[in-house]
Curated annotation (Swiss-Prot):
Subcellular location: Cell inner membrane
Protein's gene: kdpB
Phylogenetic classification of the source organism: Bacteria, Pseudomonadati, Pseudomonadota, Gammaproteobacteria, Enterobacterales
Main location: membrane
Highest taxon, organism lineage: Bacteria
EC number(s) recorded for this UniProt protein: 7.2.2.6
Annotated residues for binding of Mg(2+): 518, 522
Protein name: Potassium-transporting ATPase ATP-binding subunit
Length: 682
């Protein structure tokens, strides 16, 4: 994947974010965040008080109130800046996608065949159901399905991957995306969407959508923050009559400062940025999420359904063993197998040549120099091989070789039958080698389990996530692969109906399920799963059923998707813990300063030894604003992620962000107080 990654603080993005932060000062924009709306209203109130003091309408220190007002405005601006910066990064990613969209003409066919008469029309006029012909060098004008032809397609503008891919009619590789380019040959495509509804349009709208819908957890946290704000608002409101009854009423400016410092402004100011950044990180992994809800659900997933081929295994079978028939030595079998594979350019064929070379030092020979004739594999014969020096060597499936042997007057040995069954039972694919009518033995082709996958599954198990392998293999083969890969469970001989039933079973138990898919037959299960990652190379039906699309079409990406989702939830929880813990230090700073004149006993709470009541209040307000700026990188990048159990993760975050939230404000407020004193501003 070669898509350019944005630096955390691009100069252009910073300038745009500062401009947007000022624009977001409007009441309508602030109302969307109730906590920051209280800070905004407090800023307006203290500004009006400052003006009234300057004009002599009310008594009080205009300088002190003005400085408090200034830092309250900074608090609002910093929160706006965090959100604007996160949105700006997403919009920059969207702009790179917009560059893919090009105004072009399309050859709209009057009949669904490549030699039909065509009309040149603007691509914007194409409608769902239209048939178009696309040739080498053309931009594909719409999303659709290939109904005729095959071609090499450059999808780098969408996926960031420079290697071209093959798109052809039939099967699971018939889906094409508008904006990609044909490199060779031609395709006849049936458009599947109307203008403005293409995959690219939906990607751009999702990435740059300013009116982002809040996720359920985000809504729940917002309700908690509103409740805390109301509690602190009521508590602060009661302090004025309390102090007035004591004979020395606290000023409105001090009460406003106390309120702003006590309400959870840190997480309130960063909450939206965390959500936007989560979707941006997902896009950075080349995964398009249709909503923040999908990203959040990925963090809560506790069951992963993983296809065996391509996800758990490499997907290309490799020769792993030569098993000779009775009376045949292994070297003879290896030599015949290598000869039959010399001109076989498939991964399986090359692996047979290499295994024979490794086991018996059989050097690769040139077919032409041997004056041999290579017999290619066909769907009808299901065999391939070589004719050399009156020797007829073939390799192929068990059934094909049996028919070949019997047609040449031979018989298929019982011991080879047993070897074939043993190979299949161990999760490998048997290929039988024959010379003339004599069966020489079996080649075991094994789909290799990916390196390190067992350790990754162990990490997922620590986190409380169950892994389930999905395969069409028989139960014995599936069991062997499951044991080797270290998955928790498996579904053998899987059908679309069986996958759908399994997902519903887990969901009935209260679990959240994630899966990947690329075929039309995967669509029902993708639609049912809580996190459904469709492959970009898959069919249109699969992409529409999923709530995420992996542009790299890498099924293993599902594990990374879960990591990103969990990181977003951890970031939100960690900063919430830090924000609430902050209140303790601010309490020790402001309460003694506000009420020491009325109740001298409260001086005992001035554990930080702050210089004066005014410097204590101002230091707390300044710290409250600056901490938002210092935490913006953490909100955008996410907290450090480690694969731990829920309880271990909770303990770790309480130590780091809970204790940190208690200690950092004490240090920060004291440092600011000292600086104010040194500058003569205390």
């Amino acid at each position: 994947m070669s898509r350019k990654q944005l630096a955390l603080f691009e100069p252009v993005l910073l300038v745009q974010a500062l401009t947007d932060a000022v624009k977001k000062l409007s009441p309508r924009a602030q109302w969307r965040n109730p906590v920051m709306f209280v800070v905004w209203a407090s800023s307006v109130l203290t500004t009006l008080l400052t003006l009234a003091m300057v004009t002599g309408q009310i008594a009080g220190s205009a300088l002190f109130t003005g400085v408090i007002s200034l830092w309250l405005w900074f608090t609002v601006l910093f929160a706006n800046f965090a959100e604007a910066l996160a949105e700006g990064r997403s919009k920059a990613q969207a702009n790179s996608l917009k560059g893919v969209k090009k105004t072009a003409f399309a050859r709209r066919l009057r009949a669904p065949r490549h030699d039909a008469q065509a009309d040149n029309v603007p691509a914007a006029e194409l409608r769902k159901g239209d048939i178009v012909l696309v040739k080498a060098g053309d931009i594909i004008p719409c999303d659709g399905e290939v109904i005729e032809g095959g071609a090499s397609v450059d999808e780098s503008a969408i996926t960031g991957e420079s290697a071209p891919v093959i798109r052809e009619s039939g099967g699971d590789f018939a889906s094409v995306t508008g904006g990609t380019r044909i490199l060779s040959d031609w395709l006849v495509i049936a458009c599947s969407v109307n203008p403005g509804e293409t995959f690219l349009d939906r990607m751009i709208a999702m990435v740059e959508g300013a009116q982002r819908r809040k996720t359920p957890n985000e809504i729940a946290l917002t309700i908690l923050l509103i409740a805390l704000t109301i509690v602190f608002l009521l508590a602060t409101a009661t302090l004025w009559p309390f102090s007035a009854w004591g004979g020395n009423a606290v000023s409105v400016t001090v009460l406003v400062a106390l309120l702003v410092c006590l309400i959870p402004t840190t997480i309130g100011g960063l909450l939206s940025a965390i959500g936007v950044a989560g979707m941006s990180r997902m896009l950075g992994a080349n995964v398009i999420a249709t909503s923040g809800r999908a990203v959040e659900a990925a963090g809560d997933v506790d069951v992963l359904l993983l296809d065996k081929t391509g996800t758990i295994t490499l997907g290309n079978r490799q020769a792993s063993d030569f098993i000779p028939a009775r009376g045949v030595d292994e070297r003879t079998l290896a030599d015949a197998a290598q000869l039959a594979s010399l001109a076989d350019e498939t991964p399986e064929g090359r692996s047979i040549v290499i295994l024979a070379k490794q086991r018996f030092n059989l050097r690769e020979r040139d077919v032409q120099s041997l004056h041999a004739t290579f017999v290619p594999f066909t769907a009808q014969s299901r065999m391939s091989g070589i004719n050399i020096d009156n020797r007829m060597i073939r390799k192929g499936s068990v059934d094909a070789i049996r028919r070949h042997v019997e047609s040449n007057g031979g018989h298929f040995p019982a011991d080879v039958e047993q070897n074939v069954e043993n190979v299949a039972r161990l999760g490998a694919t048997p290929l039988v080698v024959v010379e003339g009518a004599r069966v020489l033995g079996v080649i075991a082709l094994k789909d290799i389990v990916k390196g390190g996958i067992k350790e990754r599954f162990a990490q997922l198990r620590k986190m409380g996530i169950k892994t389930v392998m999905i395969t069409g293999d028989n139960r014995l083969t599936a069991e062997a692969f499951a044991a080797e890969a270290g998955v928790d469970d498996f579904l053998a001989e899987a059908t679309p109906e069986a996958k759908l039933a399994l997902i519903r079973q887990y969901q009935a138990e209260g679990r959240l399920v994630a899966m990947t898919g690329d075929g039309t037959n995967d669509a029902p299960a993708l639609a049912q799963a809580d996190v459904a990652v469709a492959m970009n190379s898959g069919t249109q039906a699969a992409k529409e059923a999923g709530n995420m699309v992996d542009l790299d079409s890498n099924p293993t990406k599902l594990i990374e998707v879960v990591h990103i989702g969990k990181q977003m939830l951890m970031t939100r929880g960690s900063l919430t813990t830090f924000s609430i813990a902050n209140d303790v230090a601010k309490y020790f700073a402001i309460i003694p300063a506000a009420f020491a004149a009325t109740y001298p006993q409260l001086n005992a709470l001035n554990v930080m030894g702050l210089h004066s009541p005014n410097s204590a209040i101002l230091s707390a307000v300044i710290f409250n604003a600056l901490i938002i700026i210092f935490l913006i990188p953490l909100a955008l990048k996410g907290v450090s992620y480690k694969p731990l159990s829920a309880s271990a993760m909770l303990r770790r975050n309480l130590w780091i962000y809970g204790l940190g939230g208690l200690v950092v404000p004490f240090i920060g407020i004291k440092v600011i107080d000292v600086l104010l004193t040194l500058l003569g501003l205390a």
